[in-house]
């Protein structure tokens, strides 16, 4: 059983009552850093974080606390976050933004751009996905922070599942595997997400709790899919919303998720 810290409380996100007014960032991040340090001290496996600018600011601040205590933080980074690419284009233009995604030097950019022109559509997509993942990884990592998992945002996962473009999700899994990070597929349709056909080790992350809150399409069908997934040793399961937005106690939740063979 692994436990991961989630970032929603640090940014005022609550799926039951919606977003709430936030305290000053300095005060909020001080408290968040304390929680992050405590999660490491209590054996949490990592921290799932969205790749937006505030997420980066939180990691930068947490790094100072980590350095003081000589601790290491493992990140599971949720991508894509559109504003990251928007910021690149706004700051550097289309060509400049592409250059920063593909290569840090002029010669490297020319080489990468030339290579893209002669790629197949699938190869082109995978090259861009890989470059984007590598850029995000480099942005968040430092001596005390390692990004060892990349999580495909459920908006994109579920859109691809709905369109039956399973190939796009598998390409994401392949790109992560190629650069040595764990691919995580976040979905609100876990039954379909667990049915993806690939032998590459990956994680399926979904809402799961005893109340059936935000569990789709139903708690019974997800339970059955979890049982069937037990035969797929290369697929791990992570559960979100285990407290059902505060409607369940931690004491009530842990035995249930442990029996279900999912990490939280």
Predicted features and spans:
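N-terminal binding-site loop/beta-alpha segment at the start of enzyme catalytic domains
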Residues: 1-68, 253-256
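Short acidic, glycine/proline-enriched helix-loop-strand junctions
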Residues: 58-78, 181, 235
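Structural beta-sheet core signal
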Residues: 5, 75-77, 185, 239
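Acidic/glycine-enriched edge-of-secondary-structure segments
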Residues: 12-24, 47, 120-127, 205-215, ...
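Well-ordered, non-membrane alpha-helical segments in soluble/globular domains
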Residues: 22-36, 52-62, 125-139, 164-172, ...
